[in-house]
Design a protein with these regions (language model features):
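A short, aliphatic-rich beta-strand micro-motif
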Residues: 123-131
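Short beta-strand-to-loop transition segments that serve as allosteric relay/switch motifs
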Residues: 72, 139-148
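GAF sensory/regulatory domain recognition
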Residues: 43, 53-80, 84, 104-107
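Signal-transducing coupling segments at domain and membrane junctions
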Residues: 74-75, 102-124, 144
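Acidic/proline- and glycine-rich, intrinsically disordered low-complexity segments
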Residues: 75-99
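Allosteric cytosolic regulatory segments
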Residues: 159-166
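Signal-transmission linkers at sensory-effector interfaces
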Residues: 1-30, 35, 137, 171-197
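Amphipathic alpha-helical coiled-coil segments that mediate homodimerization
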Residues: 20-28, 33-52, 56, 88, ...
Length: 198
C-alpha cells in the first residue's frame, strides 16, 4: 500500500512538471514581448516550486543584468548588474553548472551581498544556467526564506527551464517576418548538407 501511494505521488509530480513545461511552451509561442514571456515563466516557477523569490538574469557583455523577477524585486529590473564571476549567480554563469544550497546560502564563500536585493534574507538557493546554442546567456534563480532541501526533480525542472528560456531568447532574436518567410525545410536540410528538390 505504501509503495502504491509513493508511486501515485511520483506520478502526480511528473504530471505537474509536464503541465509546467506545457505552460512555458505556450508562453514561448505567443505574440508577446520577451519581457512578458520571462515574467510569465517567473510566475509559473514561483507557483510550481512554492519559492519566495525567482529571478532571471541575462548576459549583457561581461555582466549579468536582472531582467525578470516576481513582485518583490520589480523596481530593480534592469538596475541590478553583476559580473559573470560575482556571487552565486555569477559562479553558475561562469561554471555553466547548477547550484543547490539548502540552507544558509548567505554564508557560502561565493555569496555576494547586493544592497538593492535582500538576498541575505533567503536560506535556500537553487540556480541554473540559461543556455542558448550551447552558450550561457543568463541564469535563473529560485530562493526560499526557510531551509529547503532541493530534490532531483526540482533541479531537473530548473535545468530544463533554463534551456527553454534559452530557446525563447534565441527565437526572440529572429525578426517576426523572418519566422514567417523562411523556408524551414530548406533551413533544416541545408544544416546537414542536403539540398531540397526544386
Amino acid at each position: 500500500m505504501a509503495k502504491a501511494k509513493e508511486l501515485e505521488s511520483r506520478l502526480q509530480r511528473i504530471e505537474q512538471q509536464l503541465r509546467l513545461f506545457q505552460k512555458v511552451s505556450r508562453f514561448m509561442v505567443r505574440d508577446m514581448s520577451l519581457q512578458e514571456v520571462l515574467q510569465g515563466i517567473v510566475s509559473l516557477v514561483v507557483e510550481f516550486t512554492q519559492c519566495d523569490s525567482c529571478l532571471v538574469y541575462l548576459c549583457d557583455r561581461d555582466d549579468l543584468v536582472l531582467c525578470a523577477s516576481n513582485s518583490h524585486h520589480e523596481a530593480q529590473i534592469g538596475r541590478v548588474r553583476l559580473k559573470l564571476n560575482e556571487g552565486l549567480t555569477g559562479w553558475v554563469a561562469r561554471e555553466r553548472r547548477l547550484l543547490a544550497i539548502s540552507r544558509e546560502a548567505y554564508k557560502d564563500p561565493r555569496f555576494k551581498y547586493f544592497g538593492e536585493l535582500p538576498e541575505d534574507t533567503f536560506e535556500a538557493f537553487l540556480s541554473a544556467p540559461v543556455i542558448a546554442r550551447n552558450k550561457v546567456v543568463g541564469v535563473i534563480n529560485v530562493q526560499h526564506r526557510q531551509s529547503h532541501q532541493h530534490n532531483g526533480g526540482e533541479m531537473e525542472v530548473l535545468t530544463t527551464l533554463g534551456e527553454q528560456v534559452g530557446c525563447a531568447l534565441a527565437l526572440a532574436r529572429m525578426a517576426p517576418h523572418t519566422v514567417e518567410s523562411i523556408n524551414h525545410a530548406e533551413l533544416v536540410l541545408s544544416s546537414v548538407g542536403v539540398r531540397p528538390r526544386a
